[in-house]
Amino acid sequence: MIEQEGTFPLPLFIIDLQWFAAEDEGRSEDPTETKLRKAREEGRVPKSQDLNGAFVMLFTSTSLFLLAPFILRECIGVLRFFFTRATTASIQNTGWFFVFVRYFMKLALPISFVALVSGVAANIVQNKTVLFSVKSIRPQFKKISPDVIRFFKRSFFSTEGLFNLLKSLIKITAIFFVSYFTIRNDLFMFVSLLGVSLTQSIFYITSLAGKVLLEVSLLLVVFSLPDYFFQRRQFIDSLKMSRQEVKEELKEQEGDPLVRSYVRKQMQSLVRESARNTTDADVVITNPTHFAVAVQYEPAYMTAPTVVAKGSDGTAYRIKRLAKEAGILIEENKPLARALYTQVAIGREVPYEYFNALVLIFTKLDKFKTHAQRKR
């Protein structure tokens, strides 16, 4: 023992508190949507096995309780069938095997179906959807590690290990007391079974067993709720990222910052050039606040009206301001402005289907009025 003045004796065996710290030290950032999506594609989702087991046990126990008369009747039927033919049946007769299989399927299929559906329902409750991933069932030999120290560290000296140990102790204790008090309340009924028939005794014992199963199942559902929230927190912690990992992911998604800066400068240059081309337009068609499209038409060398500038929000405001300063017609036409903005690139001709709408606008311009009068 190591003693210090004014202190309590310290044991030689000291547990390193770092064993209880987060294993992924330095990972302080919450996982991004991309990482969560990749984990989901790999079949890794927050899931409580206790909640799955509790759901399966609850619904299976309820089904057994409700189907008890049917199960008892079928069991008696199969016993009667084989016992009444025991002396006359031939071992070489394969028909008896199929009779047994038929009885077995009638007894097992309903319960198996309920267990399957309840298991799927538990997963849907936890993840709001049905998830199937082939990656999660592929063998991963890299997970087989001979690191015994790490195994014991994770199993006994980690937050998850301590939580699982405490959870198991509480569940065992609670199940024991629930079963004990349920049976103790009906303990005196066991004495009266000596004076009743075998069928009544079996019925009473199965009813009591079903009651215990239902109570224990409900208890397990209640106990599985904290485990569900704990597993969700552990899942998020396991996917946490360092700041460098977040930066790398953003770089992969959006490209290198230098490339993004170059692209942004090119886009700004195009916007400025587009705005300058506004002064060459004959008309500016607006949304009126969100979009602005400048259209030019010179019959002498153009086969169709051409979009020379366009923009949204701030760029649209600049285009309208330049058009107003240059005395260019600004025409409000929401459907046409939206269609030209989304479908026609700068420098491209306007599609034929919009000619009728443009003709109505261009006839308001003096130069096209003169051109039309000359044609007449």
From Swiss-Prot:
Keyword match Transmembrane: yes
Entries under InterPro entries matching the protein: FlhB, T3SS_substrate_exporter, T3SS_substrate_exporter_C
Membrane topology, as annotated: Multi-pass membrane protein
Keywords for the protein's UniProt record, in alphabetical order: Bacterial flagellum biogenesis, Bacterial flagellum protein export, Cell inner membrane, Cell membrane, Membrane, Protein transport, Transmembrane, Transmembrane helix, Transport
Lineage, opening ranks: Bacteria, Pseudomonadati, Spirochaetota, Spirochaetia, Spirochaetales
Top-level lineage group: Bacteria
Protein family: Belongs to the type III secretion exporter family.
Name of this protein: Flagellar biosynthetic protein FlhB
Keyword rRNA-binding assigned: no
Role noted for this protein: Required for formation of the rod structure in the basal body of the flagellar apparatus. Together with FliI and FliH, may constitute the export apparatus of flagellin.
Subcellular location: Cell inner membrane
Listed PANTHER family: FLAGELLAR BIOSYNTHETIC PROTEIN FLHB (PTHR30531:SF12)
Residue spans crossing the bilayer: 51-71, 97-117, 161-181, 202-222
Primary localisation category: membrane
GO terms under biological process: bacterial-type flagellum assembly; protein secretion
GO cellular component terms listed in the entry, alphabetical order: plasma membrane
